[in-house]
Amino acid sequence: RQVVRLLDPNRPDVLTIGFARRFATYKRATLLLSDRARLARLLNDPERPVLLLFAGKAHPADEPGKALLREIKQLMLAPEFIGRVIFLDDYDLRLARWLVSGCNVWLNNPVAPLEASGTSGIKAAVNGALNLSILDGWWAEAFDGENG
């Protein structure tokens, strides 16, 4: 229910940015969090509200990946990010389907050249989302100089 409410198509005033995948350090889930004051200004602009959705899991043996999850969960509790940064628990195929079909922008910013494919961006593009990506994974092959 939370996902349906967050991705409400009747709220076109909110730009929804999605990042949902396995949490590994090279995927840089927390890159946008490096300048928190700037991020707070961007997300809380009353003229252009933005929602940043995260979902995913770390491998059980990946302690740095689990630390990234904790960092995002702590951030979403900070007063300036409540309701603007959201981590959705219990990531699975059903939730992934909702996210790739409901986000306006799909974020892909791994350390190049470590992303083998990054198929979530393909699924988001097929559903009409814009991809905000570096040239790695599938985007390195799809980009032709005229399409983005």
Which positions does each model-derived feature cover?
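Glycine-rich phosphate/pyrophosphate-binding loop
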Residues: 1-12
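Short, conserved catalytic or adaptor-binding loops enriched in Gly and charged residues
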Residues: 8, 74-80, 142-144
